[in-house]
Structures are given as structure tokens and as C-alpha cells.
């Protein structure tokens, strides 16, 4: 059985209250150095660990952050979670992860909230309709203005990316993504024939939606995410060998797939920089209860195919930034 405070007190030969004050570093705990040494020895001998839930009840803080993310077998999801984990650990917090289902729902959020996390990190796509947690929350890539928001700064990079477009273009994005509205605004500014398509999380259903796009044969396709790009490239090679659209992609990585001739350019961003800003915003809310949620933009830049910066993204091995 797990040792209790009473077990520690009995072994140390002191009362229960004194052990509790010792553990809580109470200023009212008056005891001799010998008594402190006996309590410390008993704690070590019994390998006593304070109850996290009891500590949370006393302090009102669990020092734990909840993250809703995609399947951790996905390289980007694992990389993103690991960056957050490392940042939080450096600041005295732990990370609790809930993996979303095929579509956004409340289950993952409720799981984390029920475990008394101090705050939440989630993507805009993970926000169910008419639902928002009543605790500090940082949301990234979202068109929904709730909580502290971290969005890509897309104005200039999208204008630069769409400058070369001379035909119909389809934009492929996830639900609630900031990319959707930014893409449509940029396309409107340039007078382009553009359509935004919402992609599902589920890979099989996503492949079906990508297949529909290929059947419609837009001259240009812009997609937010390298995983969707790889799926699209496979479809083009296997099922639509005669269809060769120009591809624009948002990527936070380098890799051999950048060698594909159909890629006309990349809107590039750095996930590590974004995570630091996102976590800093959230911890600011948690540690300063009077602070209000804020919105920030993280930089993106367009790298046209053939430029030195684009060529630098063509690495032999896949690397996430």
C-alpha cells in the first residue's frame, strides 16, 4: 500500500500535524533540527510521495497544462507536443496530453479539465461549436477569437505566393483555420477565381476529399500542411498521372519532397518559435490572474521555387523546424 502521512509520523515518532507542516514548509512549524532529520529520514525510508490532488486542493494549482493534439504517430504532432513539453518543464510545469478523435468534440477537452489542469493548449480545429473552457486557454491557428490566440501572419506571404497564380486555385484547410479567411481575402485582392475547401482530420476521408479536388482539376492548389501535400502528391502520381497542377504549400519543415517539380513555392514558418510564444502567453494568463487574453502573430515568409531560401529546404532527410 502507498504510505500515508500517518505512517511517516509513526516512524518518525512525531504527530501527524507536524509532518504536514514540515512538508508544506509552514512558518508555524517549530521543531528541532533532530526532529526535522527524523521526519526526513522517515520520508526517505517509506519513499513517501505527497498526493498531487491534495496539493492541488491546497494551492489551487496543479502545475499541469493540458494539450489537445492529433495522433502522436504523426511526426508533426509528436514534434509539437515535445516542444511544448520541454518549454513547460523548464518553467516548472508538466504536460498532460489528450489525443482528439477523427473530428473535434468535447471529449478530449473534458478529459483534461476533469484532471484539474491549470490551462489548455489547442488548435482552432479542436474547438467544438459553442463550447469554450472556462480556464486559461491558448489557441493556435484559429478563426475563432476566444482565449489567447496565436495565428500565422499571412498577409504578405499569401500576397507573394498568389502573385504568380494565373488560373483557378483551390485552398485546402482544416475547420476553423486562420488560413481559410486569409486565403480568401488574398485571392479577392488579386481578383482570382478561388475556392476554399475544408479538409477532415481522418486520413481516409481526407483522401476522398483530395480526390474530389483532383477530379475538378484546378490549375493551382494551396495546402496548409506537408502531410496533406504528401497525400496529394501520391494521388497525383497514382490516380491522376495526366494532371499537373502548380502546388503552393505551408511547411514548417525541410525534406526531399521539396524536390517535386510541381511545387511553385513554400510559405515557411518555424514551429519552435511559435510554441515559445504560445506557451508564454498561456503561462502569463495562469500566473497573473488579472491579465486578459491576448492575440499575437507568428511570422511566415514565402519562398518561391528556385530561390536560394527554397533550395535550402531541399534536404536529404526530413526535418521539422
Descriptions of predicted regions:
Residues 156-197, 290-309:
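An alpha-beta-alpha
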Residues 1-60:
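N-terminal helix-turn-helix DNA-binding module of bacterial transcription factors
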Residues 67-160, 211-220:
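Alpha-helical recognition/docking segments in bacterial nutrient-uptake
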Residues 116-124, 169-175, 197, 216-228, ...:
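Periplasmic-binding protein-like
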Residues 38, 76-90, 156, 175-193, ...:
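Short, solvent-exposed amphipathic alpha-helices that sit
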Residues 211-321:
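Flexible loop/turn connectors
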Residues 16-20, 57-71, 167-175:
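Short beta-strand segments enriched in small/hydrophobic residues
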Residues 143-172, 204-211, 229, 267-289:
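Hydrophobic alpha-helical segments within soluble ligand-binding/sensing domains
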